[in-house]
Amino acid sequence: MRGMGNMNNMMKQMQKMQKDMAKAQEELKDLTVTGTAGGEMVSVVADGHKNIIDVIIKEEVVDPDDVEMIQDLVLAATNDALKKVDELVSSKMGKFTQGMNMPGMF
């Protein structure tokens, strides 16, 4: 029956890990990152769930004759923000998958 004690202990550890992971995922929604482009002329703010919260475009970058440049800067800032979210999620959630071979999880 010794194996049952180990199994119960393992189940308790798994339940605790699931609870801790859910808490960490909940905390991510309250964290924000800012991606920038064009020397911070365009900024995009995203939360830890990859929701875009804000887009800031400085007035001096607005040129009605070059809308494509603004589009490129917004795209670059958005990609920068999303990359930072991925890094944030990896640092926050990586401890749960450390030592496990689960590619692409976090």
From Swiss-Prot:
Its recorded name reads Nucleoid-associated protein Exig_0019
Q: Where is this region: Disordered?
A: 1-23
Recorded source organism is Exiguobacterium sibiricum (strain DSM 17290 / CCUG 55495 / CIP 109462 / JCM 13490 / 255-15)
Q: Where in the cell is it found?
A: Cytoplasm, Nucleoid
The record's section on Pfam families has: YbaB_DNA_bd
Q: Which family does it belong to?
A: Belongs to the YbaB/EbfC family.
PANTHER family named among the record's database cross-references: NUCLEOID-ASSOCIATED PROTEIN YBAB (PTHR33449:SF1)
Question: Cytoplasm: is it a keyword of this entry?
Answer: yes
- What quaternary structure, including any partners, is listed in this protein's UniProt entry? Homodimer.
Query: Do you know which InterPro entries this protein is assigned to?
Result: YbaB-like_sf (IPR036894), YbaB/EbfC (IPR004401)
